[in-house]
């Protein structure tokens, strides 16, 4: 690879996701032993990466976290608590010479929208483009998961990376190491209604999912009956959600969201925070048909299917206080893109 033959700037952007059902079943060891089913949809909230080659230092800038880290050489890419995902990505996909790697997120930190998975996909896409390598979207997702879960040792499943790489609605099946990809083609009118009536809220409470994931999977490994039953319930709900979306059955989609949330709460006592409880009550008052936490729970975002236009309900929810923020929602048919 000859630096003078390459452009000096590379950009990538990848969407985050709403996990409609089955989340947690993509996480090992459950996904390896029993297989998982997840239904998710990419959304217009994205992670952004800019890679500028040049200079003497390896410089990392996380605008969303307000953190900057500089290394004199590749030897400085280990032993840091800061920005572990970015460090891990550059260890796996090094580029020649100095650079500045800048990241930005449309979502609050710890949102539960799969922001680290989307960021990982975008970073790997930018780095491989700089290395003149071409990867399929599935390979991008797989490599981004390896960066996060193995190299950076941040536990989690694969659904976030696949949503970010692919875009759109998908039914994903997991039997490690294999991932089955089944696009879900929704009736256009139903997709528009679903978008219009989905209310996405940030609880104003950030959370780090790693500790919760580790705690739940330890309970599963020691044979905890309640946790194991909840994981199987989540898997069944994932399969049912795919059918409800195909059938354009909004009421059933809403009920399954709530079913999923009940199973999710059975995984860990800290899954539902006081802020989440208050947000749920406000959403029900505003006409929620069903809803759940986005991602692993214990803070971050929640989303609800409303009886009517979510924009009308948003006013009631925000007026309930607690610092709740309503986030914009649009389905994203396009996955990761580079330029």
Across the structure, where does each feature detected by a protein language model lie?
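Glycine-rich active-site/cofactor-binding loop and its immediate structural neighborhood
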Residues: 299
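Short secondary-structure capping/junction motifs at helix and strand boundaries
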Residues: 96-102, 133-140
